[in-house]
Amino acid sequence: MEANSGRLASELNHVQEVLEGYKKKYEEEVALRATAENEFVALKKDVDCAYLRKSDLEANVEALTQEIDFLRRLYEEEIRVLQSHISDTSVVVKMDNSRDLNMHCVITEIKAQYDDIATRSRAEAESWYRSKCEEMKATVIRHGETLRRTKEEINELNRMIQRLTAEVENAKCQNSKLEAAVAQSEQQGEAALSDARCKLAELEGALQKAKQDMACLIREYQEVMNSKLAWTLRSPPTGACWRARSRGCVRALVL
C-alpha cells in the first residue's frame, strides 16, 4: 500500500509539473502576441503617416506642374505681344519714312525723332524681354528644382511605404503564428489538464478502492479470527494463547 501510494503521489507530482510547464509556455506566448500587436500598431501608424505625406507631396507636384504650365503659357504670350509690339513700331517707322514731302528738313527731323523713338522702344522692349526671359528661366529652374526634390522625396516615401508594408505583412504573419501557437498551447493545456484530472480521479478511485479492500480484508480476517477464537475458547489451556496471537495479528494487519 505504501509503495502504491508513493507511485500515485509521484504521478500526481508529474502531472502538476506538466501543467505548470504548459501554463508558463502559454503565458510566454501571450506576452509575445502582445508585443507583436504593439509593433503592428506602430508600423501601421508609420504607414498611415507615410501615405498622408505622399498624398501631400503629390498634391504639391500637381500644383507646381500647373504653375509651370501657366508660367510657360504666360511667357509665350508675352513673347508674342513683344514681337507684335516691335513689329508695329517698325511698321510705323517705315510708314513715316515713306512720306514724300518737299520739306526735307522737316522730314529729316521727323525721321530722326521716329528713329530715336523706335530705337529706344526696341531697346526697352528687348531689355524688358531679356529680363522677363531671365525671370521666367529662373522661375522655371527654381520650380524644376523643387519638382525634382519633391519627386525624389516621393520616391523615397514609396520605398519607405514598401518597406513598412513588408514589415506590416511580416508582423501580421508573426501575429498569426503566435495566435496559432497560443491556441495550440491552450488546447494542449486543456488536454493535459483534462488528462491530469482523469488520472487524479483514477488515482483517488484506486486509493479509495484500496482502502475499501483493506477494510474488507480486515473485517474478514477479524471474522475468521473471531470464529477461531470461539472454537479455541472451548479449550481453556489454549484459549489465552489464541487470544494473544489474534490480537497481535490484527494489530500488525492494521498497521
UniProtKB/Swiss-Prot annotation:
Subunit structure as annotated in this protein's UniProt entry: Heterotetramer of two type I and two type II keratins.
Additional note from the record: There are two types of hair/microfibrillar keratin, I (acidic) and II (neutral to basic).
Family matches, as PROSITE patterns: IF_ROD_2
Annotated protein name in UniProt: Putative keratin-87 protein
Keywords: Coiled coil, Intermediate filament, Keratin
Coiled coil: 19-81, 147-227
Superkingdom of this protein's organism: Eukaryota
